[in-house]
């Protein structure tokens, strides 16, 4: 397949057209399966209400779009993690096939189901190398006030008893980046693999000199701080900072190598690859996002 290209289509099918062992790095912000939008609903449960609901949520169009809650706990909620595992299994083997031996694969995954992604990729043949924590500078946080709920019900006794308590999660100020590696030939070493395939290590010198390396924390920490700039907002609901993608690309590849993003959204991975003189292949299902990607890459070329 031609590099420096954007394929508008179904990733699970289109990746079959990529040559085996032709990619040096896969870097992708895959759907998290948490019903962020219609493209992120990867389960058959249309009445998911794991954390309960409120009258305001019932009226909200976003909850209707997500197939979200109508009544308390649903038995179908229990199937969502395994359904996410099954979805990851539909593409994991193809990812393994197209990567060079010893090549890295970085996957942005949601905290709730990341373990299912790990299992699917291990079952496909990947080695789970590490989990990097991306520490964000800000994150939306919605937690229902228990006291207010009881007050609306006219239950003042429990409203007083549970003052200060919330429903929901803590503020999500980190996101997991799962680091996988394609196994290298048995009997050899990673150093042998670097000589043969030019992948398998990480660039410590780059890491030490990069501003994302945490001051005050041991060099080459697996906690990465990266702020989201204004340029990294507004194109996609799950948009990631270009600087973060550049960091991961520089960490594991050299100029001229091929970067693949099978779920490229608004194209931040491809923009980062272009900035760093890497070849790239991006696959995206939504034609509107494919247009945005083309415009971003063209704008960078003109600049």
Q: Where on the chain are the PLM-derived regions?
A:
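Core catalytic lobe of class I
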Residues: 2-302
């Amino acid at each position: 397949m031609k590099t420096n290209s954007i394929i508008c289509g179904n990733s699970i099918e289109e990746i079959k057209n990529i040559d085996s062992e032709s990619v040096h790095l896969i870097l992708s912000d895959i759907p998290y399966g948490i019903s962020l939008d219609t493209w992120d609903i990867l389960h058959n449960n249309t009445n998911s209400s794991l954390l309960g609901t409120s009258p305001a949520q019932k009226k909200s169009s976003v909850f209707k779009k997500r197939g979200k809650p109508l009544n308390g706990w649903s038995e179908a909620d229990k199937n969502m993690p395994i359904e996410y595992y099954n979805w990851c299994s539909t593409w994991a083997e193809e990812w393994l096939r197209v990567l060079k031996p010893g090549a890295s694969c970085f996957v942005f995954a949601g905290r709730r189901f990341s373990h299912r992604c790990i299992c699917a990729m291990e079952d496909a043949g990947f080695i789970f190398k590490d989990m990097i924590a991306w520490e964000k500078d800000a994150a939306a946080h919605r937690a229902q006030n228990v006291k207010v709920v009881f007050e609306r019900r006219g239950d003042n006794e429990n409203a007083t008893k549970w003052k200060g308590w919330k429903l929901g999660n803590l503020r999500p100020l980190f996101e997991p980046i799962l680091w996988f590696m394609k196994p290298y030939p048995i009997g050899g070493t990673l150093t042998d693999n670097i000589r043969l395939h030019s992948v398998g290590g990480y660039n410590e010198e780059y890491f030490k000199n990069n501003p994302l390396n945490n001051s005050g924390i041991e060099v080459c920490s697996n906690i990465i701080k990266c702020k989201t700039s204004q340029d990294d907002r507004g194109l996609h609901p799950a948009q990631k900072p270009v600087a973060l993608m550049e960091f991961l690309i520089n960490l594991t590849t050299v100029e001229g190598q091929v970067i693949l993003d099978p779920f490229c959204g608004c194209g931040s991975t491809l923009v980062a690859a272009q900035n760093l003189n890497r070849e790239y292949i991006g696959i995206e299902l939504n034609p509107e996002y494919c247009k945005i990607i083309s415009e971003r890459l063209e704008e960078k070329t003109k600049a």
